[in-house]
Design a protein with these regions (language model features):
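Short conserved segment of the HATPase_c
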Residues: 132-144
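Short alpha-helical segment of the dimerization/phosphotransfer core of two-component systems
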Residues: 19-27
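Short helix-loop "hinge" at the ATP-lid/N-box region of the Bergerat-fold HATPase_c
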Residues: 100-101
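Short beta-strand/loop element within the Bergerat-fold HATPase_c
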Residues: 108-119
Length: 190
């Protein structure tokens, strides 16, 4: 068993080493991003008028690459303009769509928009995936709280999205009443 020659050891260990270094770099970047957002929590992002239909269609189109075969992508976003920060809104929606893609084997992933009042808008991301266990919901937005044993994440994605939502004058919540998968609601006050 211990008779592997040095060349074979190097061949085996080099890809593993590179993969671990890459994972560490990604974790360090995620930690730095989270800390930076936390330190600037009260500094809200600059907002600009933009067409959210165009943005949401584009985000969904890119996200579909990660969808499993047979998963339907649905965008129900009207052609309206709202004041927001396109880059930061895209960061949140990309993360939510990537999570949905990872845990949805069949059915659909949908992104919709609802205007709740003149100054309150919701982006609702719904999937027919595995859902989030009741016991994990409490720690969902806490840093480093992995909720699945098989996840590839670092436990900072949803907490980071929650901070970004706050800096966009909004909130990110899990719809605990939805039982056919997972539904997140990003509510922005503009």
């Amino acid at each position: 068993l211990n008779t592997i020659d040095e060349a074979t050891k190097e061949t085996i260990s080099t890809p593993i080493l590179h993969e671990n270094i890459k994972a560490l770099k990604e974790l360090m970047t995620a930690i730095q991003t989270y800390i930076s957002l936390e330190e600037t929590r009260e500094e809200h992002y600059p907002l600009k008028e933009l067409n959210i239909n165009t943005l949401c269609e584009s985000i969904m189109e890119k996200a579909k690459i990660n969808f499993k075969s047979g998963v339907e992508a649905v965008v129900n976003v009207p052609r309206v303009n709202i004041k927001t920060n396109a880059e930061e809104l895209e960061r949140i929606l990309n993360h939510l769509l990537n999570n949905a893609a990872e845990y949805t084997k069949s059915g659909k992933i949908s992104l919709e928009f609802k205007k709740r009042s003149a100054h309150t808008h919701q982006f609702i991301l719904t999937d027919t995936g595995t859902g989030i266990p009741v016991e994990a919901r409490e720690k969902l937005f806490k840093p480093f709280a992995e909720i699945r044993d098989l996840t590839q994440g670092n436990g900072l994605g949803l907490p980071t999205c929650s901070l970004i939502a706050y800096k966009l004058n909004g909130t990110l919540t899990l719809d605990t009443d939805y039982k056919k998968g997972t539904r997140f609601i990003l509510e922005l006050h503009v």
